Amino acid sequence: MLKKFDKKDEESGGGSNPLQHLEKSAVLQEARVFNETPINPRKCAHILTKILYLINQGEHLGTTEATEAFFAMTKLFQSNDPTLRRMCYLTIKEMSCIAEDVIIVTSSLTKDMTGKEDNYRGPAVRALCQITDSTMLQAVERYMKQAIVDKVPSVSSSALVSSLHLLKCSFDVVKRWVNEAQEAASSDNIMVQYHALGLLYHVRKNDRLAVSKMISKFTRHGLKSPFAYCMMIRVASKQLEEEDGSRDSPLFDFIESCLRNKHEMVVYEAASAIVNLPGCSAKELAPAVSVLQLFCSSPKAALRYAAVRTLNKVAMKHPSAVTACNLDLENLVTDSNRSIATLAITTLLKTGSESSIDRLMKQISSFMSEISDEFKVVVVQAISALCQKYPRKHAVLMNFLFTMLREEGGFEYKRAIVDCIISIIEENSESKETGLSHLCEFIEDCEFTVLATRILHLLGQEGPKTNNPSKYIRFIYNRVVLEHEEVRAGAVSALAKFGAQNEEMLPSILVLLKRCVMDDDNEVRDRATFYLNVLEQKQKALNAGYILNGLTVSIPGLEKALQQYTLEPSEKPFDLKSVPLATTPMAEQRPESTATAAVKQPEKVAATRQEIFQEQLAAVPEFQGLGPLFKSSPEPVALTESETEYVIRCTKHTFSDHLVFQFDCTNTLNDQTLENVTVQMEPTEAYEVLSYVPARSLPYNQPGTCYTLVALPTEDPTAVACTFSCVMKFTVKDCDPNTGEIDEEGYEDEYVLEDLEVTVADHIQKVMKVNFEAAWDEVGDEFEKEETFTLSTIKTLEEAVGNIVKFLGMHPCERSDKVPENKNTHTLLLAGVFRGGHDILVRSRLLLLDTVTMQVTARSSEELPVDIILASVG
């Protein structure tokens, strides 16, 4: 008997779990009771509960002791006590992976599975399938087929769900049960129909045509189960995505028809599916939004929450589509459920007008302290979107954010606010000084190291450009005096950036850095000593290279190259150009983690996509002498349609003097295998094809890779743009789709692919230059050239900027890819590295009259990159 605990025990937490202090050895000793006769069902069930508790708490049972306990437990099948029998089933499932020879209970389970006691049959099916492997499955196949079509819903559902689990290890056997599953799918029981539909889909999911037929059949005859409808909607939406989402498809019509279903869960599932379809227009969203609007006034909190959460998601891409719901959303602002109220307000922030912002901010302020950090982050994200939409409201929004920043909150919440403030500072120069001042106040009492170092990095980047940079020095130096070593190191870096950009402040900065040289921490001392020595040289090029812009190489690549250098001693100094560059995504204009990463690196930095390619190419003998990989194209280029018999995608790899084309090939014909697959290429310009590395075999639906090696132009090095015609050549061998047997004889064949373009962007790696002016001075004007062009087909500055960035493949610096409103002039600043490791910078001045006139000035450490830029633009 378990003792009864009083309320005091419950509140203190003492004794709330009677199984809390179990010992494995004691429990296994108790399990010997299973061998006693007569069987005591209540006592044995309690011991089984203890064993299950130990297993689920992660207690390790040795194979021998688990097997002994399991064999003892099998004797409990002699008892007809229903509770004890159900506990036996649970124990069999849990111990099937630990104990040996668990198949000893097969006959007992089969007997229960085919017996007259319905309460035993379903659990017996589940337990039997848990201990059955692929070799034994055929022995119980007949029983499984009978169970699937059983008239008792619990038995049928158990068999269907167990079949779904068995698919992973015995697909071919379970596939033979499709007829029984089809019969079960017409059941009147909602769970049986749902489980049968799930099994049918998973058997056929790799055959798109079979899935389409299944959807067509069940949508035509209708379904009784709302769960089955929900699953069918998900299958149909997945199929729509794979078919590039044609809205004329009967699949879309089916999903839309489900908006009129009598079950609320089906209606919501259909609305959610339409909302999440890629490329959905506002017109196609309208019926889904109307349904969600009705749910907003539902008496059920779950429906109101689901509706407003989904509308919030729609408002991110299609705010105009949600505008019709604004009145309903305003009613939800006062909802008693704070989660619903928060989502309603953030949705209104995305869809509301500029005039409603002040009122909404007051409403948010009234309950911000009552909601969780998770929803506070949602509010901050909505405010961030609002800042971009209504720049004139920056002042109101900034004040609200600063108030939130001063309140209590967790890391994610504070980080979201800091992100938002930084984006406002970068978007709106008028709010820069106000924003920096508030961030300075925040780091005076900031408990989060990551945020403190990030703000210090921002101060070092933006502070020197303000009207009165000296006012930030006190806040930064306070961090050196008061904080721990990571923040102190970030503060030292920020101080150095002020000294590198402001000659008047340099003497004061040098004094502060000299004090930091005596710091207790190695990192802080090393930084201070390094920056002190660089600044004392008073050379702009050194300041730019070692303080303001820093390294642009990949950290894992640098680590690997240094390790290789130490393993193979050489008299030559280490060449930094042999290290792959850090690829910077176009969307990431802010160097958010630079300061933090410099202070404390994570234990293991994940290899980038380019580093993975580097390893793969280094393993090919033909590419051994090519040197380090400079760049891989960001996205593979499709050279065939996705529905054709062969799917070919090409990735371009650039080396200092060569290009390697990697062709990822998939054979979608199940009655043939391709061998010795190569892609023959013919260039239109001065490129020279050197060799081909074939894919030895390309069986049905198994990807393979072949390569083509090409030498870059030598006679005219500026002729880097080129078009290659491509033909795939291979040997075809027929094979039996059922057995996979391949014919010995084959025949030669070829397949014409789309042409492949090589552009100037394939020869340039984009890099971030935080301080473009310093980088410009660092490169110098020795190899500077300038030309003026007219872009006759372009009518706006935004279009011109977008085209130039895409064409040159360089990184826009200092947010110069954002064109201010109502301006007819703009300067675009671009940075990159040309193959071979040569910095290349471009300053493009744009003037809009009737057409766009562009003055391009290019600088590099070598003449060739400058010539290539101007030749390609011309």
Swiss-Prot record:
According to the lineage, what is the superkingdom?
Eukaryota
Gene Ontology CC annotation, any one: COPI vesicle coat
Output the Pfam families linked to this UniProt entry.
Adaptin_N (PF01602), Coatomer_g_Cpla (PF16381), COP-gamma_platf (PF08752)
Its annotated compartments are: Cytoplasm, Cytosol; Golgi apparatus membrane; Cytoplasmic vesicle, COPI-coated vesicle membrane
Region Interaction with ZNF289/ARFGAP2: what ranges?
Answer: 609-874
**Alphabetized Gene3D superfamilies for the sequence:** Coatomer, gamma subunit, appendage domain, Leucine-rich Repeat Variant, TATA-Binding Protein
Q: Phosphothreonine modification sites? A: 594
Among the GO biological process terms of this entry, one is: intracellular protein transport
Task: For this UniProt record, give its keywords in alphabetical order, as a comma-separated list.
Answer: Cytoplasm, Cytoplasmic vesicle, ER-Golgi transport, Golgi apparatus, Membrane, Phosphoprotein, Protein transport, Repeat, Transport
Q: Where are the HEAT repeats?
A: 64-101, 283-320, 322-355, 356-392
Q: Where is this region: Disordered?
A: 1-21
Q: How does it assemble?
A: Oligomeric complex that consists of at least the alpha, beta, beta', gamma, delta, epsilon and zeta subunits. Interacts with ZNF289/ARFGAP2 through its C-terminal appendage domain. Interacts with EGFR upon EGF treatment; interaction is essential for regulation of EGF-dependent nuclear transport of EGFR by retrograde trafficking from the Golgi to the ER. The coatomer interacts with KDEL receptors; the interaction is important for retrograde trafficking of KDEL-bearing proteins from the Golgi to the endoplasmic reticulum. Interacts with COPB1. Interacts with TMED10 (via C-terminus).
Q: What is this protein called?
A: Coatomer subunit gamma-1
Q: Which organism is it from?
A: Mus musculus
